[in-house]
Amino acid sequence: MAKKVAGQLKLQVKAGSANPSPPIGPALGQRGINIMEFCKAFNAATQEMEKGMPIPVVITYFQDKSFTFVMKQPPVSYFLKREAKVQSGSKTPGKAKAGAISKAQIRTIAEAKMKDLNAADIEGAMAMVEGSARSMGLEVTG
């Protein structure tokens, strides 16, 4: 018989640095999930990734207090900041530019994020990434 799902929890955790301190510990603890077991499993799954990369994770927990988790790709903003080599987006996106990013870089990001985006084709995914870049104050170049 299949396990009964008790709920789902969405978190964003830095790769290789899951630990029982807030916000992970309290979020898992109040649902009765073994915190250290999750931290060890997550850190093992992300050991090959760039340390500190923010990873969205969806944890499905069951009534018997066991759990499974699915890792997604890092947010588009992370990829954009990395490609444009900026620390953060513009404080005033319509007026001041934080940096520039090329269409080729946008295509690379869209290809990496394609499975997580709600887009039918690569052009649609590129349009979403381009919109995110503009809202961060990045100039999209040829």
Curated annotation (Swiss-Prot):
Disulfide feature: none
GO MF terms, alphabetically ordered: large ribosomal subunit rRNA binding; structural constituent of ribosome
PTM (free text): One or more lysine residues are methylated.
This protein's UniProt keywords: Methylation, Ribonucleoprotein, Ribosomal protein, RNA-binding, rRNA-binding
The organism's place on the tree of life at top rank: Bacteria
The keyword Transcription regulation is assigned to this record: no
GO biological process: translation
GO CC terms in record: cytosolic large ribosomal subunit
InterPro entries in alphabetical order: Ribosomal_uL11 (IPR000911), Ribosomal_uL11_bac-typ (IPR006519), Ribosomal_uL11_C (IPR020783), Ribosomal_uL11_C_sf (IPR036769), Ribosomal_uL11_N (IPR020784), Ribosomal_uL11_N_sf (IPR036796)
Family membership noted in the UniProt record: Belongs to the universal ribosomal protein uL11 family.
Subunit record text: Part of the ribosomal stalk of the 50S ribosomal subunit. Interacts with L10 and the large rRNA to form the base of the stalk. L10 forms an elongated spine to which L12 dimers bind in a sequential fashion forming a multimeric L10(L12)X complex.
Free-text function comment from the UniProt entry: Forms part of the ribosomal stalk which helps the ribosome interact with GTP-bound translation factors.
PANTHER family reported for this sequence: 60S RIBOSOMAL PROTEIN L12 (PTHR11661), LARGE RIBOSOMAL SUBUNIT PROTEIN UL11M (PTHR11661:SF1)
Protein name: Large ribosomal subunit protein uL11
Organism, scientific name: Sinorhizobium medicae (strain WSM419)
